Amino acid sequence: MNTSILSDRAYGLLVESTIEDIRALNIEDPVERWLVFVETIRLESQVYCSRKRNQEKQIKRRCEKGIELLEQNPRLNDSLELQVHYEYFKNKLNDWTRQQIEGHQVRIKTQPRFEHCEPDIDFYATLEKKTSKKRVISHLKGADGVTKYDTEGLSDIATDFYTELFSVKRSDEGTTLKLLQNVEKRVSQKHRASMDRIITREELRVVVAKLKRNKTPGPDGIPAEFYQYFWHLIEDFYFDFITEVEKGSLPEEKNSSITSLIYKNKGDIDLLAYYRPIALMNVDVKILTKLLSMRLVTVLPTIIHKSQTAVYGRTIADNIHVVRDIIDLVNRDDEEAALLFIDQEKAFDRVSHTFLYKVLRKFGFGDRFIHWIELVYSNATTRININGFFTKKIPLRCGVRQGCPLSALLYVMIIEILALQLRANPNIVGFTINNEKLVSSHYADDSVIKITQNRCFKEVYKELADYQRASGAKVNYDKTQGLWLGKWKNRKDDPFEELYESDSQKITWTSGNVKHLGIYVGNNDPITQTFKEIIPKMIRRLNFWKPLKLPTLAKSRVIEIFHASKLFYATNFYAIPPDLEKIVTAAFLDYINFPRKKAVMSRMEMEKLRGSGGAKLINIKLKAETPKVQWLMKLVTDENLGPHRYLFERLVSPQTGPLTACQSIFAETSYLKRCKIENSFYNEALLGISKLHTFKNYPDINDEPFFYNKIFVTSTDDEIHDKTLTPFKGNKVLSKIITYGDLLNAAGTVTQPKLMAVIRKKLESIEHIRENVESHRIFGLEDGKEYEFESVSQKQIYSELVFHQSRDHPSVGKWSIDNLGVVDWVKVWDALHNQFYTEKTKSSIWEQLHLNFYTTYNFNTWHNQLQPCPLCRKIPEDVFHIIHDCKFTKVVWKRAEKVLMKIYPRTPTIHELAFGLSDTRKEDRFAVVLRNWVTFTLRHFILLEEHKTYKRNENSEVKLTPSYEKFFANFNFKATQELKLKKRLYDFQGLKDKYKSIVTVGNALAHLADGEFVWNDLL
C-alpha cells in the first residue's frame, strides 16, 4: 500500500464505507469479522492505488506535453498568462518528481528526507538501484554442494534450509533442570501482576502511536501508518479481535510472515547460513507483540545480571569498555589470560520453544503472559522471499523471530541461563574484580568468555555443550575466535583440540586483533585498524552524495546522520589518530563546499551552533572527545559500573601521582598533562573533562562544549542568590549557579554532607524544564554518601541563559550599529527558528544570511563600498542599501506592503525587512510567522535578482516587471501547496482550529467561504 493515499479524502470515505458495510453484515465472531475487514481493505487499497497511479502518469504526460509546447511558443517571455501556465506545469511536474523521490527514499530507508533540496530523481533512482542490486540473490549452494541459479532452484534450496532450521529443537529435560537451578532472581509480585493485567483500549492506543513508520508490512500489505491514521475507526474491531484471540489462538493467516533475507557482508554469499532472516509480520500481530515487549522491557533489568547489556538502561559500550580495559591491563602486567568470542549459528532461530517456556516460568512470569507468548509462537508460519518470489509455507517450530519486537527481549533471558551457569561453575575462574567474579559478558548473541587458567578450557566447553543440549543452540566453533593475551600471547596450541566432537570444529586462535561489536580489540594496534577500515568507506559514501544539491545546513545534517555515525561510534572507545583526523576534516569540508572552489565560511564559523550563526558542522575533535568525557561522568555516577571503575583505577592510577584515577577526574588540565597518561582513551577523556572545571558568574553554554548536555542542580534548596561563584568554606556553602564543571570541582574538594546551594527559582520558572527533569545520583565523594540531583538539558535552558551574554556577531560591525542599532542576535535567531517554520524556510534564511550578508566576501565588498548596486546602478552598494534603499527594492516592498499589513497591522521597518519580526505578543505568533514567511520570500527574490544581474553584468537599471510577477506567481502556487499539505497534517493530528488560526490571520493568505478554505492571490 502506498501510504500517500491515507491523506486522500476519497480513500478515507472508502475506509468508512467499508467499515459500515462490514458492520451491516452482523458477523458475530470478532475474529472472523476482523479477517473479513483486513482482506476487504487489502483488495480495495490495491484497486485505489492502481487507479491513482494511472491518473498520476496521465498528469505527468500532460505536463511534459504542455511544457514542450510552451517552450516552442515565441510569446512565452512576453506573455504573463503563458508564464503562469508554464510555471504551473513545471510545478506539477516537480510535485510528481518529488513523489517519486520520496518513494525511492522510503525504499532505500534514507532518513531524514530533505524537502528543501532540488528534485534529483536520477540520484535517488541510482541509489535505489545500487541498494536493490545488493539484495538480489543470484545463486545459492544447496546442502548437496550443487549451485543453483534459476528461481525454482533457489526456492527449493531456501525451503529445504529453513524447514530444517525451523524444525523442532529437542530440549534435554535433565540438562534443562540442571541449568535452571542457577536462577535466583525472580519477577516481583508487583511486576508479575503488571505483566498479567488485561489489555486495555488505552494501552493499545499508546502502542499504535509508537509503531515505527516507513516499515515494510506483512503478508496482508497493510502498513503501520494505516492503523495510526484510522485507529479511531477500527479500534472497536481490533479490541474485540484481540480479546477473542486470548480465549483461543491466533488465526494461521494472521500469524504468518514473509521472511526477507539480508546478507551479513561476511562469509560465502552463496550459503544461506550467511544471510539474516528478518520476519515481516502483519501489523495487527505486531501491535500485540509490541504491547507485550513494552511490559517486559521494564522487568528485565530486575532479573538480568549486569554482565548482559542488551537491557534497558545499559549500553553496548559497557561491554566493549570492559574487553578493551582487560586487554590493556593483562598486557601491561603480563598476566595469563585469553578471551573467547563465541559465535552461535542462527542464535535467534534455534531457540527451543519448550526451553523458552520453562525459562519464563522459572523467572516467575505469570500464566497469562506466558499464554500470550505461546499464542504468538504456537502455530506461526513463514514464507521465504527470494527475489520477489515466495516459497511455500514453512512452520516455525523453534526460534524467536527477528523482526518481532519481542524477540531480542526473550533471547536475553535465554542467554542469561548460559551466563548463570558459567558464573556458577567454581572451576571457571575468570577475573575477580571488587570481589566479584567476571567470567563472561553478553550483548544479545555476542558473548565473550574470560579465561585465566588452563583448567578452565575444558569446563567452558562442557558448559557450552550443556547449554546447547538444553536450549537448541549450536556453537559455531569454526567461526568462534580466541585471543591470546599477556604471557599467553605467543601460544600456538588449541586448548580445545582434544574436546571437539568432529574434525570440522576448530576455533581460530590469534595474538593479533579480533573484531568485536564492530570494533577491533587486541594486541596489534587495534585503534589504527578500526579507523582505517571506517574512514575510506565513509569518504566513498560522501563522494557519492556530492551530486545531490543540498543547502549547507542540510549537508551538515547529512554528514551527521548518514556518514559519520560509524566513525563516532568508534570514538566511544578509541582516540582518533591525528593524521586520520586531518583526513576526515578535509573530507567533510570538501563535501560541504562542493561544488564551490572557495569555502563559504571558515571551519570554525561552520562549527558554531545555528543560534550563533553557524551550520553546526561536526567539530571532529570535540565530538570524538565527548563520549569519552561522558564515560567518565558515568563511571562516577552509575552504581552498576563497579568493575569498570576498578579497571579504570588499575590502568590509570600508577600514572596520576598522589591522586587516584577517580580523583584525577577532578584535577586541572595542567596537572593531567604532567601525568602523561599512556592510555590514549583515558588521556583524552581526562583532558576533556578538565575543561569543565571552570568558575563563572553565569553558566555560559557557548563556552562549554555543546555536546556535554547535562547541567546539575540540587533538589533541596529553593532560594536564589545571584552571587559570584565561590569555593566552599567549611560548613558554609556559598550560593552558586552550577554547571557540571562546578559539580566535579566541588565533589573533589568538599567533604561536608551538604554539597552545594544553587539557583533554583530561575530554572523552575521555565515550565518546559520543570516537565523534563530527570533523577540522577552522584557517587565518589570522600565520605561515601549519596546526594540526589536533578538534571536538565542544556538545549532546554540555552535560550534562557544566553540572554545574560552580549553576543553581537563580530562581522556585523558599523553597518548594524549605524543603521539598525545594536542587533540582538539571540532574539533574531530565536525568531528565525520559530517552531512553526519548515526546514525549507530555516535553510533558506541561513543561506541568505551567510551567502549574502555578513560572513562572506560579498559583505566585505558591500561594506567597503567597492562596487555599484547592479539593480539600480547607485554607488555605493552595501547591505543596508540592497535591503532597503535600492530603487528596485523599494518597489518590491511597496508592492508587498498591502499584504504585509493585512497579515499583521504594523508598518514594515528596516529591522523587519532585514531580519523579520521577533518581539511580538505571544497571541500574535501565528500572524508573525506568516508575515516573516512573506518577508523572507521577498528578500530572497531581491537577492536572487541581485545575483542574476551581477552575473549578467548589466549596466542599466533592472525593471520590476515581469520578473516580479513571474516569481510571485510561482511563490503563490508553492505557498498554496505547502499550506494544503500542512492542513492535512493538522487534520490528522486533530488540530483543525490551530491550522485555521494560522492560515486565516487577517484573511491575508486564505479565507473561509462556506466552511471551506479559499486561497488568495498574492499578486
Language model segments and positions:
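Catalytic palm active-site di-aspartate
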Residues: 41, 218, 256-259, 276, ...
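Non-catalytic, peripheral interaction segments enriched in hydrophobic/basic residues
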Residues: 116, 305-306, 312-313, 444-445, ...
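Surface polyanion/phosphate-binding segment centered on an Asp-His-Pro turn
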Residues: 1-58, 66, 154-156, 168, ...
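Conserved pre-catalytic core of RNA-dependent polymerases
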Residues: 190-417
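Short, charged alpha-helical motifs in flexible N/C-terminal segments and linkers
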Residues: 53-163, 197-242, 246-252, 259, ...
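Short, conserved micro-motifs composed of acidic
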Residues: 192-194, 375, 388-390, 460, ...
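Short Cys/His-based metal-binding microdomains
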Residues: 859-916
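Extended C-terminal regions of large enzymes
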Residues: 584, 598-854, 858, 913, ...
